Amino acid sequence: MSYRDYLRDVVKADAAAITLYEARPHGEWGVGADAVSALDVWAFDFPGFQGLRLAPGSAPHMGYTASGYADGGSYTFHFPDGNASIARLLVRHLIPDSLPGKNAEDVVAARLDYGRLDRPRAPVRIRLNASAVRVRHDGDAASAGDVEIVYARGGALSSVRSRACVLACYNMIIPYLCPELPERQKAALRYASKIPLIYVSVALRDWRAFKDLGVSQVYAPASYFSSLALNEVVDIGGYASTRSPDEPVLVHMTRVPTAPGLPEREQHRIGRQDILSTSFATYERNIRDQLDRTLGPGGFDAARDITAITVNRWPHGYAYEYNPLFDPDWPPGEAPHEIGRARFGRIAVANSDAAAAAYTDAAIDQAHRAVAELLGA
């Protein structure tokens, strides 16, 4: 049962009241109340369940995200730059002299020496701005001794050979990158449809309007952006969040284009087209208008107070997590993400799609599995 149906048919909520919660699931699931299960949103303490007196904790048929939060997960612990610090920690472990420091606290503000990433004869080389365009075995996959990787860089194609290869890009592109994969595996890789998202960062000269209005975040279910918020305070190492409302700040705004009433994967495809066909001017106009209308009573003036805008278009955003409203309950080993991540000769697959979970730890677990498969081959 969807959350919308639950509010309408079980809670008997008024249609106008239900409208207030239509966009509430956007940030986690990329769909509205029509396409997320009531069980999943219960784990997030959405309204409508308090009288049921349900025991806390995850439950069967609950999605990955909901299960994690139901069992105590939280967004509280994160780096101020998101997953960038995790990537930088990995680079420092692989190429120690590329980044100063020794722990997670000092990595945020450390300056990377890009000249040390791709040095001849180094045991680890990271080649930036190099996009893989073809991966294939040198011969039959069952007996080949090498894998050829062709990549594009600076308008030219180059190739390298490797004893093994991990495809860590998102699943849907892999059948085009490696067309020699078995047809069943390629179909499984195409199954999921990543969640399209728009994340906007707006730099303000101060956050006095938030302070004077007594708010740090605003949920706006019928607006172009369903939410806007100041980032949570994160102090780590030499990085400190703003404390004074007279200091500059970044505001995070979220838009998730949906098509209510359709199955989730179809909504994501339509949302992706919406993102790719919308101009920056349209985003900017809506950003300025919504901030003026929301914060104007606190003295905010978009023309005066906005110093920069970054629109992050993420047409292929979060990994797809199976939705009990639309996806079957596959037997163990038969779900698309399990079929899609199967090792093929000297080629393995590892990403968040391979776990059907949009989280860093899930992607790291899949990387560990993929490398172990190749080392044991």
Model-assigned labels for residue ranges:
Residues D71-G82, I86, L157, C165, ...:
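Conserved aromatic-histidine-acidic binding/catalytic patches
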Residues R4-R8, A87-V91, I95, C178, ...:
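Non-transmembrane alpha-helical segments in soluble domains
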Residues P120, V124, L128-G261:
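Mid-domain catalytic core of redox enzymes
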Residues Y151, A203, A209-A377:
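Conserved flavin/dinucleotide-binding core of flavoenzymes
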Residues D34-V41, Y64-T65, Y176-E180, L213-G214, ...:
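Short, solvent-exposed loop/turn and secondary-structure capping segments
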Residues D113-A122, S131-V150, R313-G333:
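Charged, often glycine-rich, active-site loop that binds/positions anionic groups
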Residues M1-A130, A141:
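Active-site/ligand-binding neighborhood in enzyme catalytic cores
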